[in-house]
Amino acid sequence: MNKGVGIGGMFFIVIVSFLFSCEEKTVDYGFDNYYVEIVTAQNENEFLSDNGKIIVVSSSKNKNNYTAGDRVLINYTLLSEDASGDRYNVRINWSSKIPLGKLSLTNDSTINASAVEPIFLESVWLGRNYLNMSFYLNYRSITHSIGLLADSMRMESDTLRMYFIHDSKNDPPGYPSHAYLSFDLKDVLRNPEKTRQISIQINTSNFGNKIYGFEY
């Protein structure tokens, strides 16, 4: 298991564990359909998906305990659902907690001075009030620093502009490490009645230094 990433902003760094679990698991899916998504733990038996569905764990097999609010990547098989389609009873095939950070408000000078070493981006998407990412970075032995910044003086502009930062801390060349993470944006996206444009600038090794836009 990789332990090579700190997630946060310029003002706080929290050491986290990246995917996957230290214990290798072999899962026989048979002919079942299975689904993989990032969800939020509600209690030891329930998760909330980003589209509002309640996912209830009906089998203790492959079950892990998570704290309410944890972001978790789960692979599950659907066993049944209620008449409304808003509540699933599932069997967990595997799961793993993923890093959760917050947007750090700072100034333009700090943003321009921050390291933006490239990552190999798989995808970036907005789910509920979370910005989610899947990517690879080259990790060997030194903890990298990762964060999401915005200029505090421009919070009222039509578009909330955010900047993804990545500092390898001179980690020697190593191996591609696959990672998922989420940033909680609810503190800055406070008004659910008002549509807000948001963008995130990410320096990538496969697409260049690119800006991705979303509507919240």
Predicted segments, located by residue:
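Bacterial N-terminal signal peptides that target proteins for export
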Residues: 1-10
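Bacterial signal peptide processing site
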Residues: 22-26
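Intrinsic N-terminal pre-sequences and regulatory tails
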Residues: 4, 28-30
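First exposed extracellular module after export/assembly in secreted or surface-exposed proteins
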Residues: 32-216
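Hydrophobic alpha-helical targeting segments used for export or membrane insertion
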Residues: 10-16
